[in-house]
């Protein structure tokens, strides 16, 4: 008997069974991911100016040469990275460093730090004659650590040829000259340049081109904080980037800004509110659409700096402040996972002040962009049917994960066919985010 597949409206010549198989299962929408914090290292004193480094929790020290430090070093900039990594999966750092490079002349060479800034003054170089040979070893130190060593060298040209350039650059009038031994000598005259508002503007502009979830701005300068708030509003409302920023003592009234108004002690150090923003940014980036950070403990923290009284806490919440408290177990915890929105309207109700709810809305917006890219579907009844199927599957996925509730798939995601003409398709979508049970009221009857 004849058989095979068939095309609609194309008749077969031979009698037989012709069978087409077609899956009715809808394509599963891809999910967006979270976990990335963005930190500007303002005046780091080392590293490529305007350089962008991507650090991961799997290998946080992969960029030691460009940071000039291990993230575990006792250093205020590294502290920011460490605090963010307590919850973030990825930390992207943007380096602002417009200082002068440290230099030194030794052994007939000029030795210049790879980057500007005062960290270059901690670099030392030694040229040592190798035993039993007419060759030399050149060693590069950063602080007490030997970071590079080149052996079997005879001339300056030999050294230049093998030098990585990660820490220092060697130059000489005559590179063919033989190396000569010299004791360990420190580079000097490296300076940290003054940070200008234009440097902050350059960082904020660069942030448009990077994929991240939460930015920490670890400075308490009013005009710079205003610039950050303006940029976040622009990114959310004009660019469609579902991001938030964490700032210290920033009086704002916007769901994209988290206003941190106290801090905590860690490793014997009292952090400023600006430094505490790093942990908040990491925790916010690391939390997903079904998670709240209310009452989450701060790993390693021992005390609250600027602990609020009951009345102060009530007022702070009313003003949209994010702050730390002490739990009954004597742990430093987040009092309430809220953003700075505190003046509510019919379009921005009180639930928009809850960061878990914002993560639901932001994640859904990201998933819509992943599921419905331009030029993927036909703008006709067949295309609308496919798109509605995908959208309703997305709603069901969110409901199954516990991110939204009260889903009526048919009425909560559909194409407005009367408006969908040409290359424009309009959707009507309904969402009710699930929040965490954070205020529990018990009516107890005693007998």
Describe the role of every protein-language-model region:
Residues 88-295:
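Extracellular Cys-Trp
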